[in-house]
């Protein structure tokens, strides 16, 4: 009998309309993406960059730890020895089509040379556009050095 009354009075429909009306006037959780940006964690892992020392010299010492630890094998490094006996990279490439943005390269680097920035809005129109070379990585690092240093400092107490 109760089932017949529920069916006759359309109980489920009334319940559903109640939920709809309750949520209709509630605060919206939608973020209108291009105009509004969501806050990012200081540990967000986006586009890669290479850093320099304050005197302008690149930080990478060609230890190849990042290349060894990369699970996707997205990093390729060729190094050469300088006249003063130090080693530096001749070629440093990251293939972003292979990269899984795990952050292992950043963790393995003893000199903080390779970092993942906050940049997530990038694209490639041609096949080679997502193949990052050493000059491109250094240019990104130079452009965003202040932000990279600020994020590193904010994350330092937790490392």
Curated annotation (Swiss-Prot):
Binding site for [4Fe-4S] cluster 2: 70, 99, 102, 105
EC number: 7.1.1.-
Pfam entry (one): Fer4_7
Keyword field: 4Fe-4S, Cell inner membrane, Cell membrane, Iron, Iron-sulfur, Membrane, Metal-binding, NAD, Quinone, Repeat, Translocase, Ubiquinone
Principal subcellular localization: membrane
Domain of life: Bacteria
GO molecular function: 4 iron, 4 sulfur cluster binding; iron ion binding; NADH:ubiquinone reductase (non-electrogenic) activity; quinone binding
Subcellular localization, as worded in the UniProt entry: Cell inner membrane
Entry's cofactor comment: Binds 2 [4Fe-4S] clusters per subunit.
GO CC terms of this entry: plasma membrane
Key word Translocase present: yes
Membrane topology: Peripheral membrane protein
Catalytic activity: a quinone + NADH + 5 H(+)(in) = a quinol + NAD(+) + 4 H(+)(out)
Subunit and partners: NDH-1 is composed of 14 different subunits. Subunits NuoA, H, J, K, L, M, N constitute the membrane sector of the complex.
Function text: NDH-1 shuttles electrons from NADH, via FMN and iron-sulfur (Fe-S) centers, to quinones in the respiratory chain. The immediate electron acceptor for the enzyme in this species is believed to be ubiquinone. Couples the redox reaction to proton translocation (for every two electrons transferred, four hydrogen ions are translocated across the cytoplasmic membrane), and thus conserves the redox energy in a proton gradient.
Record-given protein name: NADH-quinone oxidoreductase subunit I
Native organism: Neisseria gonorrhoeae (strain ATCC 700825 / FA 1090)
Gene it is expressed from: nuoI
């Amino acid at each position: 009998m109760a089932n017949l009354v529920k069916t006759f009075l359309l109980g489920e429909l009334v319940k559903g309309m109640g939920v709809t009306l309750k949520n209709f006037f509630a605060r919206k959780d939608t973020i209108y993406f291009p105009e509004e940006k969501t806050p990012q964690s200081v540990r967000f892992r986006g586009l890669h960059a290479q850093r320099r020392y304050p005197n302008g010299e690149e930080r990478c010492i060609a230890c190849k730890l990042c290349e060894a630890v990369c699970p996707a094998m997205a990093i390729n490094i060729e190094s050469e020895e300088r006249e003063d006996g130090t080693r530096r990279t001749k070629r440093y490439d990251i293939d972003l089509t292979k990269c899984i943005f795990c952050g292992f390269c950043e963790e393995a680097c003893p000199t903080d040379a390779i970092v993942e920035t906050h940049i997530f809005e990038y694209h490639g129109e041609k096949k080679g556009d997502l193949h990052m070379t050493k000059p491109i990585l250094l240019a990104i690092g130079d452009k965003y050095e202040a932000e990279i240093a600020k994020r590193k400092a904010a994350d330092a107490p937790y490392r």
